[in-house]
Swiss-Prot record:
GO MF annotation, one: ATP binding
UniProt xrefs under Gene3D superfamilies: 1.10.10.410, GatB domain, N-terminal subdomain (1.10.150.380)
Family affiliation: Belongs to the GatB/GatE family. GatB subfamily.
The protein's name: Aspartyl/glutamyl-tRNA(Asn/Gln) amidotransferase subunit B
Keywords: ATP-binding, Ligase, Nucleotide-binding, Protein biosynthesis
Reactions that this protein is recorded to catalyse: L-glutamyl-tRNA(Gln) + L-glutamine + ATP + H2O = L-glutaminyl-tRNA(Gln) + L-glutamate + ADP + phosphate + H(+); L-aspartyl-tRNA(Asn) + L-glutamine + ATP + H2O = L-asparaginyl-tRNA(Asn) + L-glutamate + ADP + phosphate + 2 H(+)
Keyword ATP-binding tagged: yes
Any GO BP: translation
Top-level class of the enzyme under EC nomenclature: ligase
Amino acid sequence: MNFETVIGLEIHAELKSKTKIFCSCSTKFGAEPNANTCPICTGVPGTLPVLNEEVVNLAIKAGTALGCTINKYNKMDRKNYFYPDLPKNYQTSQFDMPICSGGLVEFEHEGKEVKVRLNRIHIEEDAGKLVHVEGEPISLVDYNRVGVPLAEIVTEPDLRSVSEAVAFMKKLKSILEYGEISDCRMEQGSLRCDANISLRPVGQKEFGLRVELKNINSFRELQKALEKEERRQRELYTYGEGHKIVQETRRWDAAKGKTIPMRSKEEADDYRYVVEPDLPPIIIYDEQIETITKSLPEMPDEKKERFLTAYELSEKEVDILIGDKGLATFFEKVVELGATPKIASNWILGDILRILNDRKIESEDMHIEAENFAKLLKVVEEGKISNNVGREVLDEIFDENKDPMKVIEEKGLMQISSSDELEKIVAEVIANNPQSVEDFKAGKTQSAGFLMGQVMKLSKGKANPKVAKELVDKKLSEI
């Protein structure tokens, strides 16, 4: 029997606010444990929350960017459950009246247009973080993250493959980044997702029992977790053990490469939602929505059209560039400084990405500035240094943002393009390799390539290849 995979996602995006959702504590990542806390976010009795207006505006911005309906009357609710990372024993969230409803995300995947409906977007506070002490039977709790504002974006179960789910997440990340709604730093946990996956026989309308997967914080882990769970369910159905699939929550264990049962899947009733009595309803006005809509910056699809028109790049190149906001911004700055778009694109998509992957860092964290990179591309394009030397210089200047011209000058890397200088080198190579000259005269044209290699070796790679080849060919033709 053939089965169809059905996937829905619940994405938690940290909103780009400098302060928490109900207090003035900082949301900055990387502080000392429990440094960014106060009596309000840790739930000390007698304290009262005050809703951060910026959080509401960012949620409206997200809803506008994703084609949602903005609900002008919505409210906060208490979601009750007990866990060490939740100091109040409830999470302030939204239940039946979210800030945004509906929405649609469209993207191309494997040659076809995919449309994924959104169910809702609601705002809520994040929980703390458990830190497990190695070798000790205890866990510590860092409450810095408690109260950090989240937008939970819930899709309909419209995804039909693991690769579609990953492609959707990349598209959503791009929209949130370009809209300046979230920084989406997955390695810092500011963009996470839970995945609901089920299988059903092809042609069946009813959904199968869904399993929720938690602890997913990268595109690679999302793919691995979904593939493993999809395989697990498929094997159970194949061997007649489909009854063993139950509606449950499973945790993705990246180290073991498998999903592990956590608990049976909760329903809304299990959380005993109640209206938050300490916060008034949220009222949103038409003027507020209009102002926020007008403030939306250029979005990914708009930027793609502009790049294709303005820079004459291939669609594949543009897709990779705009898929990383940091790279796209860097590319535009370099071009504005005079770099040829095609050359800038080739170097960014080749060498800059290579270095980022080697260093395991994000484009936002690279130190090299567009001005210095543009200088480097200029001397390469003018033939003053070779591509290979350019790559060596890039590796050296990347981390400390050095001036490439100083590095080239200090190391004497400038390419030799003077015919007078190169003629001396070519003459020496010809004189030192009489057998290769005889071979060339005998019709072995590959000998010219060998002699050219000797010219590059003698010049320590600094000979201008084009000029050097012309001189080698000329010298051989005269013999």
